[in-house]
């Protein structure tokens, strides 16, 4: 059995930054550190940080006065931000800069009195945070997930309308929704560059290349990870059997027993150690040496806040 690895895969710059913010805060201030929502959607990462003293909460009211609070990589609404400001808290923002970019687009539309449409998945924390940047009562903020949602949507003024997208969507599905928006609202204005982030796009391109060669595709990522789910869906659309797994223990030998080639990739919030564990598991089932496919090189780095720029090894 051949083992192929997608390239790129795993951590993106936004996830790296968010995890570093929590790790550095723990090193500098000591436990406990409070984090609103899972800092990234990966069970292994969250459990590891929890063991080191991070406490994950959903409501600001759960945080005691004088504590350190970190916003997750998915971002928060202005209401949550204002609630935190009203408290005696030290706040660090781990919102991915590419999510912040979308926040700024929504805030700009709100200031201008334009209505705004967000393409995204209802209930996802990134969507909740992005929708929460709009505050103009004279306008309106709407969420659509599919072309069907677009055709049933009514707005107040089609002449002052813009759209944005969640950063972790399917590139193909989002293109279909944008096409529907432009047909339904010919004057709608979109971002100069697609809001779907570079890492999401690159990993979808990589899994497409992987699925062209593999019989079975394993996507390492947690069930609540939007970008990981999109990778599994894309492989399935290409006619491959695909499984979303948290770790190597999830793999059933029956999944790969008849496969000549198994492809492995990882969502943007999944650490490489999980991929290495999957490779080891597949080798137990008769797999050969893992081969990494050629892919797009990623060199993007997002800096942590200056107050947290410290060599953790020196602190420890």
UniProtKB/Swiss-Prot annotation:
Keywords of the record: 4Fe-4S, Iron, Iron-sulfur, Isoprene biosynthesis, Metal-binding, Oxidoreductase
Transmembrane segments: none
Record note on cofactor: Binds 1 [4Fe-4S] cluster per subunit.
GO molecular function annotations of the record: 4 iron, 4 sulfur cluster binding; 4-hydroxy-3-methylbut-2-enyl diphosphate reductase activity; metal ion binding
Annotated EC: 1.17.7.4
Pathway: Isoprenoid biosynthesis; dimethylallyl diphosphate biosynthesis; dimethylallyl diphosphate from (2E)-4-hydroxy-3-methylbutenyl diphosphate: step 1/1; Isoprenoid biosynthesis; isopentenyl diphosphate biosynthesis via DXP pathway; isopentenyl diphosphate from 1-deoxy-D-xylulose 5-phosphate: step 6/6
Binding site for isopentenyl diphosphate: 41, 74, 124, 225-227, 269
Active site (record annotation): 126 (proton donor)
Cofactor: [4Fe-4S] cluster
Signal peptide feature range: none
Leading EC class: oxidoreductase
Superkingdom of this protein's organism: Bacteria
Reaction equation(s) it catalyzes: isopentenyl diphosphate + 2 oxidized [2Fe-2S]-[ferredoxin] + H2O = (2E)-4-hydroxy-3-methylbut-2-enyl diphosphate + 2 reduced [2Fe-2S]-[ferredoxin] + 2 H(+); dimethylallyl diphosphate + 2 oxidized [2Fe-2S]-[ferredoxin] + H2O = (2E)-4-hydroxy-3-methylbut-2-enyl diphosphate + 2 reduced [2Fe-2S]-[ferredoxin] + 2 H(+)
Gene Ontology biological process terms from the UniProt entry: dimethylallyl diphosphate biosynthetic process; isopentenyl diphosphate biosynthetic process, methylerythritol 4-phosphate pathway; terpenoid biosynthetic process
Binding residues annotated for dimethylallyl diphosphate, in chain numbering: 41, 74, 124, 225-227, 269
Family of the protein in this entry: Belongs to the IspH family.
Function per UniProt: Catalyzes the conversion of 1-hydroxy-2-methyl-2-(E)-butenyl 4-diphosphate (HMBPP) into a mixture of isopentenyl diphosphate (IPP) and dimethylallyl diphosphate (DMAPP). Acts in the terminal step of the DOXP/MEP pathway for isoprenoid precursor biosynthesis.
Record note on quaternary structure: Homodimer.
Protein name: 4-hydroxy-3-methylbut-2-enyl diphosphate reductase
Gene (name only): ispH
